[in-house]
Amino acid sequence: MKKKIIYISVIVIILIIIIFLMKFNYKKINFGNNESNKSANEVKEYILNINSYTAELEVTINSNKNTNKYILRQEYVSGDIEKQTVIKPENIEGIEMSYKDGNIEINNSKLNLSKIYNNYPYLSDNVIWLNSFIDNCKKNPENVNVYEENEYIVMELNLTSNKYLVNRKLYLEKGTGKPKKMIVQDDNKKDVIYILYKEIDLNKK
């Protein structure tokens, strides 16, 4: 009888340990160096409160004419810096675009803004900026949907003001809360812009 009680006690203790470990690891999100359990909505709030970031991104843009791919570096500090530099392709490498008060300044290039608009669609558009996505989410909270999809938490924004840029989805890594990719679709659900975040640092400044 005594052995039976000991056996049952051991099983109960093991079950308690297993349950504790399962709860501890359930939906663990790592923001910086602090690990804690975060729901999808908490991740959403984390993203909406980003005030600075630096990123290297691979951007694929599908226009009516062709498909263009770029490697870009972006630097953003709320109220101060909003700068984008082209790394690839080589023929426009080094072009730097600075944004301030709704105006765009082109540096290190013989191309003017009208040529960039015509030859490189969306390259100078704020739709490829993470902070633009965040601003639109804040202005249109009723059009934002947050859900889990495989290994991602997805923030989906639907706006009908531009038929070419109706649906935007930001895919966030569950383990870190970091943006991994963004997809922008038109009203026919065709991918217009695909952004892959190769590197990104959030709120470093």
List PLM regions with ranges.
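N-terminal leader/targeting segments and the immediate start of mature chains
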Residues: 2-81, 204
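Short, solvent-exposed coil/turn segments at beta-strand boundaries
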Residues: 49-54, 74-82, 98-103, 150, ...
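Short Pro/Gly-enriched beta-strand edge/turn motifs at strand-loop
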Residues: 55-56, 127-128, 153-154
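A generic structural motif
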Residues: 58-62, 85-89, 107, 158-160, ...
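Amphipathic hydrophobic-ligand
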Residues: 66-72, 93-99, 163-164, 190-194
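An acidic-aromatic
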Residues: 73-127
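A short, amphipathic edge element
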Residues: 133-145
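Gly/Pro-enriched, hydrophobic low-complexity segments
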Residues: 146-205
